[in-house]
Structure formats: structure tokens, C-alpha cells
Amino acid sequence: MKIAKKFMALALAAVLSVGCAFGVSADGSRTKDITVTKTNELSEIYEIVQKIEDTEGFKELKETVPAVADAFKKVSEGKMDLKGFTDVLKTLAEEATDETVKAAIEEVIEKLDGKDFVTGFVQFRVKDHERAEKNADGKYEVEISVPSITDEMENIQLLCYNKETEEWTVIDPINIDKENKTIKVALDDLCYFTIIADAKTDAAEDTTEAAETTTEETTTAE
């Protein structure tokens, strides 16, 4: 009985630990549930491609920069955390021959410090170029629905990759509506992106400590 209760406590700890991770499902994968808000006509002009592995751009990415394609896949499957992804970026920076590209990647690495993934990687695509409008910066402004957003999330941002320019950026949303779980952003056509936010380090530590205490109390009670 003592051993059985101890394992029950450990199982509870495992469940709670998974709950501390942003957007992680029961099988360990990260959610890609991101869509263009359907309350306006923008959903007829733009779309979010969730199955990026099926796109021609991703197939090309696997040939030109396989490390990035593999990282996108692993992040979405929940097999790579942000630290692991940052290591991939560090390698890209070391191998970069263009100093501008190298500096941009290093800047992104700095901005990712203390962050965590909220979603897996998806792709933004313009469906109707005739109706689509660019802003002053040459980007498309769109409101997206992100159900995995919570009130507790702080400093929500997007990590973006433009395959055509090989540019990595961390961008701030134009607006965030946590109540309706929507984000307004400005994106490049065909860019890949993931939602990130401040990591819940304290929450994870508290959960671990609570689980350990539960295990100890269960054992002592026996």
C-alpha cells in the first residue's frame, strides 16, 4: 500500500508538471491551434497553415536548411524546448558568413532568454493578394485566434522566420486580447512563426516542490 500510494503521488506530480508547460497536449506535442479570426473578412484574405510539413516551402527548407526544418518539427512535437532551439540558432550564427545575418540571429537569441514556447510552428499565408494590403513597413496586419493564451501569460511575442530573406525576428503584437484570446500582428507573407511568452519557472518549481512534499507526506502517513 505504501509503495502504491507513493507511485500515485509521483504520477500526480507528472501530470501537474505537464500542466505547467504552455500549450502541451497529453501526447507531449505543442498546439498549432492558431487561425485567422473569422469575425471579419480577413479570414478570406489570409490563412494560418498548421500542417507546415505539407507545404512546398517546408520541403525546400528541409533541403536548404535541414537543421531549421528539423527544429520546427521537434518543437511542434514537444521534443525540443526553447533551450534546445536556441542551441540550433547559436550554430546558425556561428556558421553565418554574412555579419548582418549573424548579428540578427544573436539578437534573437538574447531576446529568447527567459522565454518558453506557447505553440508549435505554423505559417502565415496570403490567399488573396489582390485584396491584401501592406502597412507602411511592407507587412500584412492580421488578427489571429490563439486559444492557448491565458491571463497568466506575460510578454507574449512571436518568433518569426522568413525563409526568403533568412531573417529571424522576435516581434511584439500590435494588440493582445487575452479575454477573447486573439492577437493582432504584422507579418510577412509565408513566414513561419511560433507564439512565445515568459517562462513559468517559478510555477514549475512550486509544482515540483509540492509533488515532493505530497510524496513525503504519503510515505510518512504509512
What do these predicted regions represent?
Residues K2, L10, D128-E130, I171, ...:
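Residue-level detector of functional hotspots within protein domains
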Residues K2-K6, L10, G19-T119, A132-T150, ...:
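Feature for mature exported/ectodomain regions
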Residues A132-I196, K200:
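Proteolytic-maturation and junctional protease-sensitive modules
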